[in-house]
Amino acid sequence: MILLIDNYDSFAYNLYQMVGEIAKEIKVIRNDTISVKQIVQLNPQAIILSPGPGRPEDAGVCQEVITRLGHKIPILGVCLGHQAICQVFGATITHAPQLMHGKSSYIQINQESPLFDGIAAPMQVA
């Protein structure tokens, strides 16, 4: 089972649909309705932290999940979820000089990694 922690963003259900194409069982839980202990009891194979409003420290159980389970369970963060992962591991989260929400731009992959196998560079991302 993949656990999708919903940070109160409608895109969480887009993620649910996309992940549902490759995963049989997905459980969606809001970030303020579950504890780390309950997550452990669910025994997820992986955890996805959804986008959402605000800052990582406002994302309910997410930072505690990363701190306590990140070394045991694979975690993918999208937007706010990604910011939460970065902040837990020491990054400083700041506002971008130019708002890019919903806009796309080209990126270049600068390091070889199996993570990027088969991905063309440069590529357009949002």
Q: Can you say where each PLM-predicted feature lies in the sequence?
A:
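N-terminal beta1-alpha1 cap of cysteine-dependent amidohydrolase-like domains
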Residues: 1-71, 80
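Generic structural signal for residues in well-ordered beta-strands
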Residues: 26-28, 93, 125
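Cysteine-nucleophile active-site neighborhood
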Residues: 44-113, 118
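Active-site oxyanion/phosphate-handling segment shared across diverse enzymes
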Residues: 119-126
